[in-house]
Amino acid sequence: MLRAASNFRAVANREFACAKRQLSKTTRKNATAAATRPGVPRDEREGKEIYTTVGIDHNEPKFDKILIANRGEIACRVIKTAKAMGIKTVAVHSDVDSNSLHVKMADEAICVGEAPTAKSYLRVDRILQAVEDTGAQAVHPGYGFLSENTKFAAELEKAGAKFIGPNSKAILDMGDKIHSKKIATAARVSMIPGYDGEIPEEDFCVKVSREIGYPVMIKASAGGGGKGMRVAWNDKQAREGYRLSKQEAASSFGDDRMLVEKFIDNPRHIEMQILCDKHGNALWLNERECSIQRRNQKVIEEAPSSFVPPEMRRKMGEQAVQLAKAVGYDSAGTVEFLVDSQRNFYFLEMNTRLQVEHPITECITGIDIVQQMLRVAYGHSLPLTQEQVPLNGWAFESRVYAEDPYKGFGLPSVGRLSKYVEPRHVDGVRCDSGIREGSEISIYYDPLICKLVTHGDNRQQALDRMQEALDNYVIRGVTHNIPLLRDIVQEKRFRSGDITTKYLPEVYPEGFQGTVLTHAEEKTVIAFAAALNARKLARANQFLNQNRQRSTHVASFSKTYKFVSSLPAKEGQRPTEHAVEVSFVDGDANKAKVSIGGKVIDISGNLSLSLPVNSIEVNGEHITTQIVGKRAGEITVLYKGTPFKVQVLPEQAVKYLQYMKEKAKVDLSTVVLSPMPGAIKNVNVKPGDMVSEGQELVVMEAMKMQNSLHAGKTGRVKAVNVKVGATVDEGEVLVELE
């Protein structure tokens, strides 16, 4: 796989102001792209990339300028390819995104409104005005937002600009899940049993669900990305699922039509990437496995799938192409299938856009999908035949989110990235991101930080590289889901390929609790923390004596330092305390012998508390750790993705701990707290109402997802502290019970 590179001149920073309800425009200096060899370039900030082995013909006719109607990582991704092809780029942004990376990377930038997507990125009129003002010849919609909006595609065509995606009729045919099922059936694509029509209200939803037979999947006809979807196992869940999904669909897509189909228990989610042009050519670019999901949203994807043999791959690909040709498809798209344990596959939906997880297909085929979208939109034919599409190695994508994985596998988090270092130095790593150190993760948009991609000669190598990359990924300032990702990639079932869409609840039935360490690993973490503390004390002892001569150094690092250390215990248990002794080998501050429980552990490396990443040797084995917290008597060590608070106290300090009172635990069953920042959509109770345990009290929306908040006990409502439309912070008390 070639790793293409080029250097871009630095672009001067510019502030972009956005007047309320008014379109404003700012043009920046052009950035220069000089590709040193075929492929997609990088700028100096980005390090090495993995995109494509297909070259760029700079003599081929192309667009002069395109506008990217999106934000974040996907806008940056499109800009990179456009620049490599010599195409100028225009970014659009909301007022809060004025200093975002995609704005800085583009040649021009236009502010299209306020932070809420409905007032900016979804404003078709303002995007069209930006196209006219900048003279952009075409628009790439990315994914989400307007990417599957037929009105937008049609309006662009009327305005004389190209939509870098499929024609509006294909979007309409495939975007409506009810209509797309009928087309897929006619195209002889394998189908899931279900009701072929719109579900108008709750009672009818229950009636249809009973006829199909529980469990059923209730989902939005215009949906995607896991939004507007619920699984129901009984009448009660069908009613609630219908109502919540309908509200979510209206909010996310502006279309609340619902459908119901049979839910296939324990399926795999496998999709086929397709690429079509306007000359009747259509290719399938092999499959991606997307079974690791939470709330119907993908967490880790891989390509190819370990479950799909060559003949099945061919059949899935051929059916995907049959469907594409049936609707006159003419761009990149994805046909999604559910696959049962017997390798029967059923059509799920077609995404008429560039898929989030497209990078792993690019890694195994060497085809830059964005490049081909730009070529096809201009009118060129595809450069390959089906026989020329390769399958080289294996690739994984981990979606790194600003989410708390300990809360429902990932409740969104907000904040500013105070420290941010991507692991681009690791072999076979690609990082698709739209943020940088100092960027803000807000409540208005998807909390995706980065798509971390690794490629290897085989599945094992790609997984090992992912493990190393996650260990070296430095993120401070926001809560993130790397602990969950890191635990998954080392978990036995996942590494063997034994996965379904139920993987997360089956492997983590009580929710994600963090990586469980073996006794040997516990001692490794404790020994490392003790060695760090001993080095800190030794250096402090040097400064007690103002004589900086070598003799002082030797004395400080020749002592044996004694501690009592422990890791947090499970609730209701006392932590196991370990007597630890640390000595330095020949006075070397970076070579320590740690005695713990009668076992000696040799640790070497840069034993510094100030490094973002510590790469060390423990008894000759290489491990990577991070120090993510420091306070008196405690060091928080990030090991295998999970933070562990290690208590490291001098012996004399331990005796005083018995006099320290523990904090009284707060009874949280009497209050309903906001689990994250967001907006209140529904309040279902008022003061004085009697409620039962588990009853829905409040519905809130954050980062385009609706969350139902329930009573923690049976009782009377004492106070309701919020109203519909209110914006709340994490931990805010919404409802109080007596």
Swiss-Prot record:
Annotated residues for binding of Mn(2+) 1: 336, 349
Cofactor(s) the protein needs: biotin; Mg(2+); Mn(2+)
Gene responsible for this protein: pcca-1
Modification(s) after translation: The biotin cofactor is covalently attached to the C-terminal biotinyl-binding domain and is required for the catalytic activity.
Gene Ontology molecular functions: ATP binding; metal ion binding; propionyl-CoA carboxylase activity
Positions with a binding annotation for Mn(2+) 2: 349, 351
Comment field on protein domains: Consists of an N-terminal biotin carboxylation/carboxylase (BC) domain that catalyzes the transient carboxylation of the biotin covalently attached to the C-terminal biotinyl-binding/biotin carboxyl carrier (BCC) domain.
Modification sites for N6-biotinyllysine: 704
Location within or outside the cell: Mitochondrion matrix
Active site, per annotation: 353
Chief location bin: mitochondrion
A Pfam family reported for this protein in Swiss-Prot or TrEMBL: Biotin_carb_N
InterPro entries attached to this UniProt entry: ATP-grasp, ATP_grasp_subdomain_1, BC-like_N, Biotin_BS, Biotin_carboxylase_complex, Biotin_carboxylation_dom, Biotin_COase_C, Biotin_lipoyl
Pathway of action: Metabolic intermediate metabolism; propanoyl-CoA degradation; succinyl-CoA from propanoyl-CoA: step 1/3
Keyword Chloroplast: no
Purpose: This is one of the 2 subunits of the biotin-dependent propionyl-CoA carboxylase (PCC), a mitochondrial enzyme involved in the catabolism of odd chain fatty acids, branched-chain amino acids isoleucine, threonine, methionine, and valine and other metabolites. Propionyl-CoA carboxylase catalyzes the carboxylation of propionyl-CoA/propanoyl-CoA to D-methylmalonyl-CoA/(S)-methylmalonyl-CoA.
Biotin carboxylation domain sequence ranges: 62-509
Co-factor note (free text): Binds 2 magnesium or manganese ions per subunit.
Residues annotated for biotin binding in this entry: 409
Name of protein: Propionyl-CoA carboxylase alpha chain, mitochondrial
Coiled coil: none
Keyword Zinc-finger belongs to the record: no
All copies of domain ATP-grasp, residue ranges: 181-378
Quaternary structure annotation from Swiss-Prot or TrEMBL: The holoenzyme is a dodecamer composed of 6 alpha subunits and 6 beta subunits. Interacts with sir-2.2.
Positions contributing to ATP binding: 177, 209-270, 296
